[in-house]
Amino acid sequence: LSPDFVWRDAGRVVVFRDGAIDAAAGLLAEHGFDSFSLLSTDRALAGAPGLADAAAAVHLVPSGQIPDLASDLLRVVEIPDGMRLEAQPRPLVALGGGRVIDVAKAIGAVTGARVAAIPTTMSGAEMTAIHRLPAGAEDRVAGTIRPDLVLADPEAMTSQPEPDLRASSINALAHGADSLYTPLTNPVSEWAALRAAAAIAAALDEDPGERDRAGLALGSLLGAYALDSAGLGLHHVVCQTLVRLCGSPHAETNAAILPRAMAFLAVRAPEAIGPLAAAIGTYPDRLEPRLLELGGEPAGLGSLGADRDRLDEAIEAMLQRPQLAHVPGPPLTKADLAELIDRAW
């Protein structure tokens, strides 16, 4: 049975197919993206040489913060003020990882342009309406958006070297795991999260040379779908703040924190986290070692370069996030967060 499929969901189309990148120009045209601006990176373009030729314009997205990057590119791709009544904004196609896709979503939220995403990592950004907005344009936006079209090529999404792939896979697993205990958790998001966890764990247990990359990629899509539906919780609050204030890398920070966060939550929310343990082939009291195993025994935050001098500031910032008020159990304290993070240091 082929793992390829087309998923139509409330106006969004997801095409999951081996070779989707090679067929991207035709698939884009088939779904109304005839003339488009392509946002990408040199690395991603090297894996899709024909796509740049099909684009009306190509814009490289450098490293940086999403609001600043989106603001800079907005000036380039936006229809001038006087033309807005006479012309529709040119669609945007994002070929790359989470940064590229989030920049496209941010611009689309301002201009009204349709957005298509062709992910080259397991960031999950292609499945969510979670993104920052262009700096200086926040008052021009009614809300955030998700791509209308996703072209998911499993080989492209899982092409990283083994250590990086494991960190990205745990990050993808975390998307679903964090959605299991929020106020918006529902049967659909729960099913997607648990299916994602099972698929990712099964693939990571395999020999790297024989790994089910389609399973990893599907797990990434489903986990991000669950997060988009039910929202985020403790794990993402901790990771996002550590990355922003303490300077640790994104995927690796998730790989270090998730085992400790889920072990912490297994005590507070056994009815939510117990099924997660079962999905990855373990028991609730063995979640931490199992997730560490799946992550390839990831490095601690200290080894990742996190700035311990800013940890108190980071914890105070975490406690201000509204999502923590909904974490099951007694109200979280500074000591709770400090202990969780210290275990991952």
Range-by-range predicted roles:
Residues 81-122, 238:
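A short, small-residue-rich loop immediately preceding and capping a beta-strand
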Residues 182-289:
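Active-site segments that bind and position negatively charged phosphate/pyrophosphate groups
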Residues 6-8, 30-31, 84-87, 108, ...:
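Solvent-exposed alpha-helices and their adjacent loops that cap or buttress functional pockets
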Residues 106-188, 195-196, 272-275:
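A glycine/threonine-rich phosphate-anchoring loop and its flanking beta-alpha core
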Residues 1-91:
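ATP/NTP phosphate-donor binding region
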